[in-house]
Amino acid sequence: MKITNLVDKKLASDYVAIELLKLIKDKPDAILGLATGGTMTDVYPRFSELLSANHVDLANVQTFNLDEYVGLEPEHAQSYHTYMHQLLFDHNASWNADNIHIPQGHVDDLEREARRYENQLKQIGQPDIQLLGIGENGHIGFNEPGTSFESETRVVDLTESTINANSVHFDHIDDVPKQAVSMGLNSIMRAKRIILLAFGERKRDAIHQLLNGETNESLPASILHQHPNVEIIVDDTIFNRL
């Protein structure tokens, strides 16, 4: 497990955007595993700028997002469909819509949707890079503490701490979805390379536990100890207090 310290979120986001660009230049049919949330808000605009500046053809690039809220239509302002299109997909015309994969959280049969998404992941292949954030309680994706390390894509109940953390994006806490369709920990671990980003004081304890604690299901991110190619990128706020 490699630890990379970059001064702040901007420099870290630039670094990740460049890593993604290098991958696609080397492998035009790359598979990207993408995350959402506040951690990634600078990564995708910078990545988009680099794609445009380098005139990269994205027609054969596949993307898989980690998760989507249950109950939100794709067009909802706080859906992860909207997030990804606003920050990335709408800015580069060569993205192939058929190759953009995000779970559907608004369908009637959510269990069927979870199975469909997991099967699609397995059929298309291992992500070359999987981006991750980390929750204050150590969750990755929406895999909350206690999630089985063998878990695959499924419907998950969000914890109170996750709902509270996500409430900043909604008008009222009652509007925050209580469930999501999320890739499982086993799904995530199939990626060839994993890059986890964490910024700010609120994420310091989770990173400290990840780096110094045991591998067990009470800290979902600790499964990353078992992966051969993980890079954890942190800012000075975290690194200087580890």
Swiss-Prot record:
Q: Could you tell me which Gene3D superfamilies the record lists for this protein? A: 3.40.50.1360
Q: Could you tell me one molecular function GO term of this UniProt entry?
A: glucosamine-6-phosphate deaminase activity
Q: Keyword set for this entry?
A: Carbohydrate metabolism, Hydrolase
Q: Which reaction does it catalyse?
A: alpha-D-glucosamine 6-phosphate + H2O = beta-D-fructose 6-phosphate + NH4(+)
* One Pfam family linked to the record: Glucosamine_iso
Q: Pathway, per Swiss-Prot/TrEMBL?
A: Amino-sugar metabolism; N-acetylneuraminate degradation; D-fructose 6-phosphate from N-acetylneuraminate: step 5/5
Query: Where's the active site on this chain?
Result: D67, N137, H139, E144
Source organism superkingdom:
Bacteria
Q: What is its EC number?
A: 3.5.99.6
Q: What class of enzyme is it?
A: hydrolase
One Gene Ontology BP term is: glucosamine catabolic process
SUPFAM superfamilies hit by this protein: NagB/RpiA/CoA transferase-like (SSF100950)
Q: Name one GO cellular component term.
A: cytoplasm
Give the transmembrane ranges: none
Q: What does this protein do?
A: Catalyzes the reversible isomerization-deamination of glucosamine 6-phosphate (GlcN6P) to form fructose 6-phosphate (Fru6P) and ammonium ion.
**Similarity comment:** Belongs to the glucosamine/galactosamine-6-phosphate isomerase family. NagB subfamily.
Protein name as catalogued: Glucosamine-6-phosphate deaminase
Q: Supply the source organism for this entry.
A: Staphylococcus haemolyticus (strain JCSC1435)
